[in-house]
Amino acid sequence: MFHGSGLFALLLMVLEWTRPGLSSPLRPICDLRVLDHFIKEAWDAEAAMRTCKDDCSIATNVTVPLTRVDFEVWEAMNIEEQAQEVQSGLHMLNEAIGSLQISNQTEVLQSHIDASIRNIASIRQVLRSLSIPEYVPPTSSGEDKETQKISSISELFQVHVNFLRGKARLLLANAPVCRQGVS
């Protein structure tokens, strides 16, 4: 009897969360283990591509965000500037990884590409749950100084891992919504 009532309670909770017609805001996702899951998947993709040599070159160089963090500069930025940098980086990574879908890829590589694109979309959803501003494209078309060009798929996935471990983690760890209960 308890098993059935527990399952029923779980079903009621799920239905409550997914009830159509309610426009309730997303609950903040402050647990960094969520990001750790995405980092692990990105790391798995990078590890799989490490052994790839000739088959992993990219026809044209792609632009990706720089992953190094100058902590003095980062701490001096307000949350909107930090959010814009992370959202911009996620946008660049999504564009770069998405550009790989055009070429003929192995099934393994294609699965890593698809997973990475889904993960970036999920990370954006996590940021949205934390009321972090969406990506706003820059008004000038000048080349951003916070970017680099890369020429291999393994480099791309390495940048993806490092970006998530660095700037994305810093932003999530210090999101104002998550710090409200901390004194």
Swiss-Prot record:
Changes after translation: N-glycosylated.
Any one Gene Ontology cellular component term annotated for this protein: perinuclear region of cytoplasm
InterPro entries recorded: 4_helix_cytokine-like_core (IPR009079), EPO_TPO (IPR001323), Erythroptn (IPR003013)
UniProt subcellular location: Secreted
GO BP term (any one): pronephros development
Alphabetical UniProt keywords: Disulfide bond, Erythrocyte maturation, Glycoprotein, Hormone, Secreted, Signal
Superkingdom, natural source: Eukaryota
Glycan attachment sites: 61, 104
Cleavable signal peptide: 1-23
Tissue spec: Expressed in heart and liver.
Pfam family of the protein (one): EPO_TPO
GO molecular function: cytokine activity; erythropoietin receptor binding; hormone activity
Intrachain S-S bonds: 30-178, 52-56
Family statement: Belongs to the EPO/TPO family.
Function as written in the Swiss-Prot or TrEMBL entry: Erythropoietin is the principal hormone involved in the regulation of erythrocyte differentiation and the maintenance of a physiological level of circulating erythrocyte mass.
Protein name: Erythropoietin
Classification of source organism: Eukaryota, Metazoa, Chordata, Craniata, Vertebrata
The gene coding this protein: epo
